[in-house]
């Protein structure tokens, strides 16, 4: 099973366990909203919040949600800025490309994606560090976090998440066999 199929089953199972309550999902650094909107379309018993610092990205996400008839909440802010409450899941595809690598990217990436969406600062991990540090304040007990990561960031993500107290930290490979998704669970102590 690939990660998308596994996650669809997981969101539906989480919804079943919450009975009539909606599963609360935060898509942080949402960009076009494709991750959060896809979750909403696959599992209707979710309450999806899409958050991004870019007004332009949120405009695209809003259009995508409208075109797909997906009911979502949009919030503009820098990471957790303006986010209230706790979530069952935090999903994030933050900028993760090291600054010095961006110039060497394929033209279809570097010339068509805003630098804001790509630049993960010096080592590509800056946004992960910030999100991992703050995420426990926004996760329900046993809340889960999912990150899209760069192909060579798996070991660093395991260390960062484990050091912050996440359990069951795993890195999942994509169809090419490269590290692509890092996941973990945060339990209240």
Language-model-derived ranges and their functions:
Residues 1-92, 97-103:
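Conserved SAM/SAH cofactor-binding pocket of Class I
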Residues 39, 109, 131-135:
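Class I S-adenosylmethionine-dependent transferase superfamily signal
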Residues 73-75, 116, 170:
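Structural signal for short hydrophobic segments within the conserved structured cores
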Residues 96, 185-188:
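C-terminal beta-strand of the catalytic ATP-binding
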Residues 96-126:
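Mobile active-site "lid"/loop adjacent to the S-adenosyl-L-methionine
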Residues 122-186:
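Conserved Class I SAM-dependent methyltransferase catalytic core
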